[in-house]
Amino acid sequence: MKTVSQISELRAQVKAWRQQGLTVAFVPTMGNLHAGHISLVAEAHKHADKVVASIFVNPMQFGVNEDIENYPRTMINDEQKLTAAGTDLLFTPSPDIIYPKGLAKQSFVEVPNISDGYCGESRPGHFRGVATIVCKLFNLVQPDVACFGLKDYQQVQVIQRMVEDLSMPITIIPVATIREESGLALSSRNGYLTEEEKAIAPALHQSLHWLGEQIRAGYAQQDSIDFIGLAKHAAKTINDAGLHTDYLHVCHAETLQPASEDDTQLVILAAAHCGKARLIDNLQVNLA
């Protein structure tokens, strides 16, 4: 694996591949990699000849109360994992490379409506930062495909909408969430959990699974489904386990608007605090 930090080096390598007629897949990350990230690289290999990954802790997507300085940085281990996964090129720019004029003077990308609720409401400006850095990285790498984990379901929908609205010739590949045996979704944030907290954290996914089963049962029996009431019950179960629910909603799987009884493609979106960690998870419910 080749590692570069300059835009000119990145573009030169991608240009050389293009001249050979090779296709390119892209996996953007913020580092502190786990098996979920590596599954994105594995999926990327299925769709292109060469795989580019990036590691960049993006200051634009951190809020005023989120400490970017304490975000885990594990570059040596990350490089080893990406090399073992067969990554061809790693791009590791500094903030000065990405935002040479500083954040205050940086143009930005904002994806309306779909960015507004859920994590967008809990973390104002977060998806503006995500959309901006992903758009910029897409312009730099110019991949044929890009892989994103479905654990961050709203993020995937935001990026998909951005690609569609801006007519980017890039296929977005959503990749299934990798979980621990307990059902807890793998996340860089899990490192903040104590052993006691790690024991109760799976209550988040367990409650989503219960809620999904209730929705499927109601649909099968052609009953009226009280999405809001069921979601409140699931949130109470999460809180009773010792977590603090940030939000839990049943939504249309594509628009992320509140679910209606006519919808057959649903997603349950949730976030909860467990100690110092803010955990997010989701469950897709297909009723068709």
UniProtKB/Swiss-Prot annotation:
| Compartments where located | Cytoplasm
Look up the record and name the pathway of this protein.
Cofactor biosynthesis; (R)-pantothenate biosynthesis; (R)-pantothenate from (R)-pantoate and beta-alanine: step 1/1
Task: Name the residues that bind (R)-pantoate.
Answer: Q61, Q155
Q: Cellular component GO terms, alphabetically? A: cytosol
Q: Where does beta-alanine bind?
A: Q61
Q: Where is the active site?
A: H37
What is one process in the GO biological process aspect for this record? pantothenate biosynthetic process
Where, in this chain's numbering, is ATP bound?
Answer: 30-37, 149-152, 178, 186-189
Q: What Gene3D superfamilies is this protein classified in?
A: HUPs, Pantoate-beta-alanine ligase, C-terminal domain
Q: Name one Pfam family in it.
A: Pantoate_ligase
Q: Which SUPFAM superfamilies match?
A: Nucleotidylyl transferase
- ATP-binding listed as a keyword: yes
**Any additional notes?**
The reaction proceeds by a bi uni uni bi ping pong mechanism.
Explain the purpose of this protein.
Catalyzes the condensation of pantoate with beta-alanine in an ATP-dependent reaction via a pantoyl-adenylate intermediate.
Q: Which HAMAP family match?
A: PanC
Q: How does it assemble?
A: Homodimer.
- Name of this chain's protein: Pantothenate synthetase
Can you name the source organism?
Answer: Colwellia psychrerythraea (strain 34H / ATCC BAA-681)
